[in-house]
Amino acid sequence: MNGLHLIQYLKEASYPVTGTPLVAFLGDSVTHGAFECLQGAGENCNFDFDAVYHAVLARELRRINNWLPVSILNAGVGGDSAKGPLARIDRDVIARRPDLCVVNFALNDVNDPLEVYRASLGEVFDRLAAAGIPVILLTPNMMNTYVHPDTIPMYRAYAAVTADYQNSGRMDAYVDAARALAAERDIPVADTYRRWKSLAAAG
């Protein structure tokens, strides 16, 4: 799904013709807007809310179709996994009545058992569906494939772990599980992960 597909999706959504569609983005630090974290998360992270992907998307949508303004609801939380929204989805998303919710989890979920991810993401999808909110699954970016020599010492051990998650196929398994859950529910998929894999394979 690209920008033009999203515009068509929004045009067909059930919001007033004179209104402005609200698109919620539910996810982790990538959705929140964190670009680097020097120690832990939260205040120690560098956030750029103008460069976060959904802000870039909003600008692109305006460029493609400037007569259909789109409002963005950032419901990303740094460090979150798919089980995190189960405690906050009513307040952070459903109560705001978005016309569409884009869901993006997996990067932190690889630290949990795969079945926990499946169950949690499935419940997120089902609760949004029960509230009448259409969903798009956005698959995540790849993890690192090696530990760069300039990696900050305190992060080297975890960088080795995430490189193993990526190279061993663990990350692939979680993304495949998300795709399967979406397919079972006829949820459209914006497959960023597939693009990353293609780029990595091309060098």
What do these predicted ranges mean?
Residues G76-G78, N141:
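Short, solvent-exposed turn/loop segments enriched in Gly/Ser/Thr/Pro and often Arg
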Residues G27, G76, F105-D109:
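Short, histidine-centered active-site or binding-site loop motifs used for metal coordination
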Residues N2-A75, R88-R97:
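Serine-esterase "nucleophile elbow" of acetyl-processing enzymes
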Residues V17, V56-S71, G84-G203:
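Alpha-helical cap/lid subdomain in secreted, periplasmic
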